[in-house]
Curated annotation (Swiss-Prot):
GO biological-process terms attached to the record: anatomical structure morphogenesis; plant-type cell wall loosening
Domain Expansin-like CBD: 172-252
Record-annotated Expansin-like EG45 domain positions: 50-162
Name of this protein: Expansin-A2
Topology versus the membrane: Peripheral membrane protein
Main location: secreted
Highest taxon in the source lineage: Eukaryota
GO cellular component: extracellular region; membrane
Biological role stated in the UniProt entry: Causes loosening and extension of plant cell walls by disrupting non-covalent bonding between cellulose microfibrils and matrix glucans. No enzymatic activity has been found.
CDD domains: DPBB_EXPA_N
Xref: PROSITE patterns: EXPANSIN_CBD (PS50843), EXPANSIN_EG45 (PS50842)
SMART domains: DPBB_1
Lineage of the species this protein comes from: Eukaryota, Viridiplantae, Streptophyta, Embryophyta, Tracheophyta
Cell compartments where the protein resides: Secreted, Cell wall; Membrane
Length: 255
């Protein structure tokens, strides 16, 4: 990187800090807020697989290349996993590419308190930052920009098919990974019910979108209630058959 490029990135970084701390009034601007974005994961986004939401292979789970790791201020301890955001690069015509993208939250961008917020600590609180999969970033900005100011807002997630439930764990510890959630995309609460009981049991978030139950459920068909952050609930009755096995994935209803 030559001196001119370094000076540009340093200047942009300082401007970006001021940019991201200013919030747009959502009532006047359709919910748009301001933040900033960088990229990671390589040209093929292979470095974005896995992540703090627990989705694993983002291609097989349907999230693909349009993904983002969120800073602490946005990630909310995993509660925003699966949420969809529209982003557009703003206020830098030299590096911005017109148009917007929609990305899903699939990972956490951890803070780095050894670095200043305006000089490498992009994901430090209270900054609202998106570390985008590289192919997604390149749709709104040039590679050499490194970091750009963005406008962003929550948007509904459009998904094909139903909500997916992947059953992991052991007979006395069921860990259910929930993916492909439409609507708000992120989940507020999950309950399950075995076919041998009339009672719904609340599940607890273990990490990301992995939800746990300590109830013995082998030999029972399973039903799920999923409530998103908008407060809407989808019930998938007997979506898991009685002869289910750990490692299997089942598809239920959708928002």
């Amino acid at each position: 990187m030559n001196l001119t490029e370094y000076s540009h990135i340093l200047f942009l970084s300082l401007c970006t800090l001021n940019f991201c701390l200013y919030s747009i009034n959502s009532d006047d601007n359709g919910g748009w807020e301001r933040g900033h974005a960088t990229f990671y994961g390589g040209a093929d986004a292979s470095g974005t697989m896995g992540g703090a939401c627990g989705y694993g292979n983002l291609h097989s789970q349907g999230y693909g290349l349009q993904t983002a790791a969120l800073s602490t201020a946005l990630f909310n301890s995993g509660q925003k996993c699966g949420a969809c955001f529209e982003l557009q690069c703003e206020d830098d015509p030299e590096w911005c590419i017109p148009g917007s993208i929609i990305v899903s939250a699939t990972n956490f961008c951890p803070p780095n308190f050894a670095l200043a917020n305006d000089n490498g600590g992009w994901c430090n609180p209270p900054l609202k930052h998106f570390d985008l999969a590289e192919p997604a970033f390149l749709q709104i900005a040039q590679y050499r920009a490194g970091i750009v100011p963005v406008a962003f807002r929550r948007v509904p997630c459009e998904k094909g098919g139903g909500i997916r439930f992947t059953i992991n764990g052991n007979p006395y510890f069921d860990l259910v990974l929930i993916t492909n959630v439409g609507g708000a995309g992120d989940i507020r609460a999950v309950s399950l019910k075995g076919s041998k009981t009339d009672q719904w049991q609340s599940m607890s978030r273990n990490w990301g979108q992995n939800w746990q139950s300590n109830t013995y459920l082998r030999g029972q068909s399973l039903s799920f209630q999923v409530t998103d952050s908008d407060g809407r609930t989808v019930v998938s009755y007997d979506v898991v058959p009685h002869d289910w096995q750990f490692g299997q994935t089942f598809e239920g209803g959708q928002f």
